[in-house]
């Protein structure tokens, strides 16, 4: 019997030890510490440090001569070596010089495929023609802008918030009466109105008009010409290259960005 009691006692102790092993240790004892307010005139304060946020890196820098140049070069800086970005050189006649530059330069700007632009014209040609009636904007220019801006996708949305075929920013859309930028007809109408306004603002200068469409007319005025942003400096020749292709889709190719055009094929 004594042996049975001993065995039972040992089993009980082992079971108890297993329970104790699974029991977590108590939390350490914490005591609240009262901090007295500083005495009047004391300089001791609780300081909270927030890591300062770096300012945005400027997109332009000044040279020793005082000229403002892009902080990062664009892909087509050679274009601007031959076509002045300055507003003092503006005028509608600059289109010919710009197109000659594109055609004769050793470096080429990739132009959209004619088939791609033809498909965009088939899908949106009627809306483009309707929107450009009575304006200073060639349908061929609108087609070029649409191709470069959205590749013809009516649902395109940029990281900056530009929307639709002609990539209208919300403020620009509101400014020109667009209530839904995702509706192609409205988007095209708003984009054409903006281009038409820019044509009047910059005396039909194709270089400044396209720069204003990309960067805003305020930036063009601020920099007295094409803003020295790599994106804008690349955008202008890209649209002009697309305009050259778009001209070939017109029954009568336009000479200026204000000339009329009827696309050979439309839905």
Each language-model region and where it sits:
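Substrate-binding/active-site groove segments that recognize
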Residues: 156-178, 190-195, 199, 211, ...
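Second-shell loop/turn segments in exported
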Residues: 111-119, 127-133, 153-159, 174-184, ...
């Amino acid at each position: 019997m004594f042996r049975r009691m001993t065995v039972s006692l040992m089993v009980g102790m082992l079971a108890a030890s297993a329970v104790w092993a699974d029991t977590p240790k108590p939390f350490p004892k914490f005591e609240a510490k009262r901090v007295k307010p500083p005495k009047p005139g004391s300089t001791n304060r609780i300081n909270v440090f927030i890591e300062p946020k770096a300012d945005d890196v400027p997109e332009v820098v000044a040279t020793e001569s005082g000229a403002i140049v892009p902080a990062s070069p664009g892909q087509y800086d050679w274009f601007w070596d031959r076509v002045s970005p300055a507003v003092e050189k503006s005028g509608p006649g600059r289109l010919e010089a710009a197109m000659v530059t594109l055609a004769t330069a050793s470096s080429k700007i990739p132009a959209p495929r004619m088939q791609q632009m033809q498909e965009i014209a088939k899908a949106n040609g009627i809306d483009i023609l309707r929107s450009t009636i009575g304006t200073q904007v060639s349908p061929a220019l609108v087609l070029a802008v649409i191709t470069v801006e959205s590749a013809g996708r009516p649902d395109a949305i940029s990281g900056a918030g530009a929307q639709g075929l002609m990539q209208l920013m919300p403020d620009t859309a509101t400014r020109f009466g667009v209530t839904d930028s995702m509706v192609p007809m409205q988007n095209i109408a708003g984009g054409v109105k903006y281009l038409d306004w820019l044509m009047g603002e910059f005396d039909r200068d194709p270089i400044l008009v396209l720069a204003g469409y990309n960067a805003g007319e305020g930036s063009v005025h601020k920099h007295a010409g094409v803003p020295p942003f790599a994106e804008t400096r690349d955008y202008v020749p890209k649209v002009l290259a697309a305009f050259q292709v778009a001209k070939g889709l017109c029954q009568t190719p336009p000479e200026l960005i204000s000339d009329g055009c009827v696309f050979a094929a439309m839905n």
